[in-house]
Amino acid sequence: MAKSPTPIPAPPVKIQRDTNGVAPAAPATKPKKAAPKKRRKRRRNPLLWFLHGLIRRIYFGLKTASRLVLLVPILVFMVAFSYNVDRSGLFQGALAPRRIVNLMLQGYDVTNFEQMDERQVVQLFAQDVEQAPEAIGIGSSRVLQFNRENTGVDTFFNMGVTGADVRDNMTSYYKMVSYGKTPKVLLWSIDPWVFYGSEDAFDSRADADLYNEFLTKVLNVPTDYEEPDKVELWKALADPAYFQGNVDYYIKNRGQTTVTDDDGNTIEFNPVQGDPYDQTTTIKRSDGSVLYDVAFRTQTADQIRTLAAEACMSFNSVHMEGFDEMSTTQIQAFESFMDYAREQGTTVILVLSPWHPYLYGYLITEPELHKGFFQVENWLREYCAKNNVPLYGSYDPECIDGLEETDFFDGLHCAGTGIARFFPGIPQALQQLETGTLPDPLAVHPRTSLESADPDVVETLNGETAETAQEG
């Protein structure tokens, strides 16, 4: 076995010594840092925490509000502009009636009466007139000849409408009261169908919802009336699209003599040009009364009598078809309304506008067909005597001294000359009421049949009596 080679010796380890001959100590290991102690959270004061949050919210709220404040004038302008222009009539009423009322309030007479929505005009007048008139008139077309001249009141306004029924009468006055413009005097030309309880007594143009509102809120009569929800309606005021539409409409019609509606159609209601008494069409006066065209106002007695004769066959169709008896319900409504007006501080003056002599003479020949009609006047006379209510006129033309056929336009409508024969004017009526010198309502006895008239004297179409016609 061969011997291994001689191993190489390891080199000697050099030991460094310090100057004193001592070997240095082994290097010490670096001590570990002690783990930091976990700090204990300081508990917040709840009050301070709340105040801090509150201040923070207020700060950011004010910061946001300061930016929004810059938008407020713009929003206010949009709302005000849309409300006043209101091209769709959401708040101010339809454009055509608004134009009529605006012209009347400026003192203008207005053309094209036959095309007017009279009921809208009346309601918008109540809304827009700044101060309450001293006196207003209500009733059907039979009241429309009362004006500022024959009533003697400079601020009188006639709120009568064609075909007015009991609902039109009462709601016209109610609108004035609800707008805070209660008149001192209410002149009511009361028609017999006010006391008829049938649907035939109602006009389809009357505002039934407004009447139900009046019955429910004022007279406490149960109806199906419900307060309308106007939230969605008022949202339109802040609608940018509605604002833009109103701007377009305003720019289009500003300064124009011809005004259009929302659809671009011309609104044919304009100030009367020239003498109002020389117009070829019927016009609406600035006081609400009506001035018929010159041809209708200047008819001869024969022409007027012919129209009265034509009304004989259709008399009951004027809200009195089947009117055999006064309605207890309508009597109660009338009495409640009169009490309501007194509570508002309004003096009510009742007027019975006469019918043409030929027409009334015909009616008393068939009293069985007009029982309800003939009951009304005597009942009203008893009511006025009992309650000290001023009453002027009579349905029976023979009860009015000096009344002539030419004091009428036709069978139903008495002219201003006829009114002057029985109505002294509002100032004198109020004076008579104050001094206790009112005409005695029970001193007048209207004819209700031939038994209360001369049975041998009945007027015919040509103006003769039946007695003289037989002799001829």
Predicted stretch roles:
Residues M338-E366:
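Active-site segments of SGNH/GDSL-like serine hydrolases
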Residues Q131-D224:
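Membrane-embedded segments
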Residues M1-R42:
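N-terminal targeting leaders characterized by basic, low-complexity, disordered sequences
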Residues K63-N84:
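Hydrophobic membrane-insertion alpha-helices, especially the h-region
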Residues S204-Q344, P439-G472:
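Secreted/periplasmic serine-hydrolase-like ester/acetyl group-modifying domain
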Residues D407-P455:
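Histidine-centered active-site loop/cap adjacent to the catalytic His
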